[in-house]
Regions:
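Structural signature of hydrophobic alpha-helical transmembrane segments
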Residues: 1-13, 58-75, 114-130, 156, ...
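Juxtamembrane helix-loop boundary signature in multi-pass membrane transporters
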Residues: 1-8, 103-160, 267-286
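Membrane-interface interhelical linkers
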Residues: 1-11, 20-68, 79-89, 137-154, ...
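Hydrophobic/small/kink-forming positions within alpha-helical transmembrane segments
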Residues: 10, 14, 18, 45, ...
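A helix-boundary/kink motif common to multi-pass secondary transporters
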Residues: 28-29, 90, 113, 117, ...
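Alpha-helical transmembrane segments of compact multi-pass small-molecule transporters, enriched
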Residues: 38-43, 97-111, 188-192, 246-260, ...
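Hydrophobic alpha-helical transmembrane segments in multi-pass integral membrane proteins
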Residues: 44-55, 105-118, 161-174, 223-240, ...
């Protein structure tokens, strides 16, 4: 069953990237992140009360709570980097770099969670790394060219923090009902996101958010909520070194919709990279 949750997470995560891209064409990425986190938090707590897990709140241990908070901080940092990268770079390049966090996640899972690393997983890591390199070599669009290579730094930061999120989340979610754990860590992300808005002086931009972009920001929040609930349920029941690669298959959904919505096309080199990324991901499932 956890495999189905992992694939559900991938579907919603793929939609999240496209919806978020639609919502940050004019809206500041930090402001958009803070707004969408409100939606995710509301969605998460709604699920908590639907399944009745709020009664277990007092039973959460200090260790579990600590790792949930750390996971939330890592998630917040990953989001801030990711949506800034999406704002200034091509979605077809940003997403592969972000998804390369799978490599680091697996290595950390082997080191800290003592999960096994087979020959197939090792080959998958190599393919994933090679595919990511091929995809980020894709020709830049006019908008991305103006931004230079700064998108790559933000995308890489997103990948590092995302991998930490998976490991910290795996440790934290093991001692609490998955919906409740997701809701708690989302609260941490919310606080961090709004702190960044006001610390960077972006609060004045809240009133300038276009209504049509606000709709997409909220929809991306709902998609994120769905992805998180599926992901952490899968992470609770399944190994992180397998759940994470399945979740990263969201790249297929993202690239399909980026072609349909943003008309971003893949070159032969980047298409080969996509095949390598998907092939590497599937190898990790063996």
């Amino acid at each position: 069953m956890w495999i189905l949750y992992a694939f559900g997470s991938a579907l919603f995560a793929g939609l999240t990237a496209v919806l978020a891209k639609c919502g940050i064409r004019k809206t500041n990425s930090t402001v958009a992140t803070a707004i969408r986190t409100i939606v995710v938090l509301a969605f998460s707590w709604l699920m908590v009360f639907i399944v009745g897990s709020q009664e277990r709140l007092s039973a959460i241990s200090e260790k579990t709570l600590l790792f949930l908070i750390l996971s939330g901080l890592a998630t917040g940092a990953s989001w801030l980097c990711y949506f800034r990268a999406l704002q200034i770079g091509d979605i077809n390049k940003v997403v592969p770099v972000d998804k390369s966090s799978t490599v680091l996640t697996i290595l950390l899972a082997v080191i800290f969670l003592h999960e096994s690393l087979s020959i197939a997983k090792g080959a998958g890591i190599v393919l994933l790394a090679a595919g990511t390199y091929l995809m980020i070599e894709k020709k830049q669009s006019d908008g991305a060219a103006k931004a230079g290579s700064s998108w790559l730094l933000y995308a890489a930061g997103s990948a590092v923090f995302a991998s930490l999120t998976s490991i910290l989340g795996k440790i934290g979610i093991s001692g609490v009902e998955s919906n409740l754990g997701t809701a708690i860590r989302t609260g941490v992300v919310l606080v961090m996101s709004w702190m960044m808005v006001f610390v960077t002086g972006k609060g004045k931009l809240l009133r300038a958010v276009p209504k049509n972009e606000l709709v997409f920001i909220c929809l991306s929040g709902l998609a994120t909520g769905g992805s998180w609930l599926c992901y952490y349920k899968a992470l609770q029941d399944g190994p992180a070194s397998v759940v994470a690669p399945i979740d990263k298959l969201s790249i297929l959904v993202t690239i399909l919709f980026s072609w349909l919505v943003f008309h971003e096309k893949l070159t032969k080199k980047s298409a080969a990279g996509l095949v390598a990324v998907v092939g590497g991901t599937l190898l990790m499932l063996l």
